[in-house]
């Protein structure tokens, strides 16, 4: 790896994403963010020799050599523009909760200030014959959140629906060719913010950002304001 962030990889982290941004608010409940960010996975393998060495190390330990893929380095710098708006409760009379829309554009840079040249898919990884730049799979994002009112609570507020969020992502090169959809439902059960989610598409992991997968899960969502 040959950049400032690559030399000091984050410990026990698979997605490192610092961003500097300027936020401009207005009186209509919306804001704009203009940012410069860096995203990486904190790994070090960036050539076939290092990959083969790691591969053989796993084999020598009687583990699958393919585990070496987890050490492949990924990193990008990008510029971004975000717009978010919280709509008045009475925008849709049939819904008495709060609706929030968010749009984001990230342009991944060919030579960033922090990363330098991007570290993305290498053809030596699987003998491929074509590039798979990140902008084919990511860069345009839209999310729609609905924050439920307290009317959606039962058993004396021991169970409440908190938030429903739909997220759609695609690349800005060949738009809508590679799409990712995520649906999340957050509830509050006895004070615990339990989240159910399902995802279909790309970017489930920075190493394999170009692989199409379907996944779902259950977790806890803690948000600090």
Spans of model-derived segments:
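Outer-membrane pore/translocation modules
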Residues: 1-176, 197-200, 211-212
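Surface-exposed substrate-engagement region within the catalytic domains
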Residues: 152, 172-175, 180-187, 191-193
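Outer-membrane beta-barrel "beta-signal"
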Residues: 196, 213-225
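Histidine-bearing beta->alpha loop at or near hydrolase active sites
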Residues: 203
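Short proline/glycine-enriched turn/loop segments at secondary-structure junctions
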Residues: 206-210
